[in-house]
C-alpha cells in the first residue's frame, strides 16, 4: 500500500501472503513497527527489491507532485500481470459540481491537494506512465449521512453523527445514484 498511513487497510488483509507499505511520516512508521508487526514498512519504494502482485494507493495521488514519474516507478515494481488500484477524490464531486458548498470546496481544495482528477485526467496520466488496459470505476465513498452533515453542519463527519438516523440501505441507494451521475 503506497502511502499506507497508519496501516489500517493492510491490517484488514488477513489472508495476504505478505503485507508491504510505503509511508513517509515517521510517526506512522513507528506505529506500524510497534503495533502492526505483520506489515513490512519502508519509507521509500526503492527499499523494496521485489515485485508486487497488487499495489494500492488510496487518496494519495492527489497529494503528489510528479505523478507520472511516481506511477512509472510503481509500474516497474509490479509483476507482469500485476495490478494497481488507485482511489482519488473526483474533481467533479457532487458537492462541488451540483451543490457548490463553499465549506466543502475549501475542505477539498486545501493546500495539500495538488490536483483533483477527472476520468480523463486520470486516464491520461496512467497512459503517460505506461499503463494499458486501464479500467476506471466510480465509487461513492461517503453516503447520504455524510452529505447531510455538509448540508446541515457545513463540515465533515456527518457519516459519524447521522449514522444512527440513516440506514445502510438509504446510504447505498444514495451512493449508487451519485455514481450514475458520473457515467
Where are these regions (language model features)?
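S-adenosyl-L-methionine-dependent methyltransferase catalytic module, highlighting the catalytic core
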Residues: 65-73, 83-183
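Conserved SAM-binding loop
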Residues: 1-101, 111-128
Amino acid at each position: 500500500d503506497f502511502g499506507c498511513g497508519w496501516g489500517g487497510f493492510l491490517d484488514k488483509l488477513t489472508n495476504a501472503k505478505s503485507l508491504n507499505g510505503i509511508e513517509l511520516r515517521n510517526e506512522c512508521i513507528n506505529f506500524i513497527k510497534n503495533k502492526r508487526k505483520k506489515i513490512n514498512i519502508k519509507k521509500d519504494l526503492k527499499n523494496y527489491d521485489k515485485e508486487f502482485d497488487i499495489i494500492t494507493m488510496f487518496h494519495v495521488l492527489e497529494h503528489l507532485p510528479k505523478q507520472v514519474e511516481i506511477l512509472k516507478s510503481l509500474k516497474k515494481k509490479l509483476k507482469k500481470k500485476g495490478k494497481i488500484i488507485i482511489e482519488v477524490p473526483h474533481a467533479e464531486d457532487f458537492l462541488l459540481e451540483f451543490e457548490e458548498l463553499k465549506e466543502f470546496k475549501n475542505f477539498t481544495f486545501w493546500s495539500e491537494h495538488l490536483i483533483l482528477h477527472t476520468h480523463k485526467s486520470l486516464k491520461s496520466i496512467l497512459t503517460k506512465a505506461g499503463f494499458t488496459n486501464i479500467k476506471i470505476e466510480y465509487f461513492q465513498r461517503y453516503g447520504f449521512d455524510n452529505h447531510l452533515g455538509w448540508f446541515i453542519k457545513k463540515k465533515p463527519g456527518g457519516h459519524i453523527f447521522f449514522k444512527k438516523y440513516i440506514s445502510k440501505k438509504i446510504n447505498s441507494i444514495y451512493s449508487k445514484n451519485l455514481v450514475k451521475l458520473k457515467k
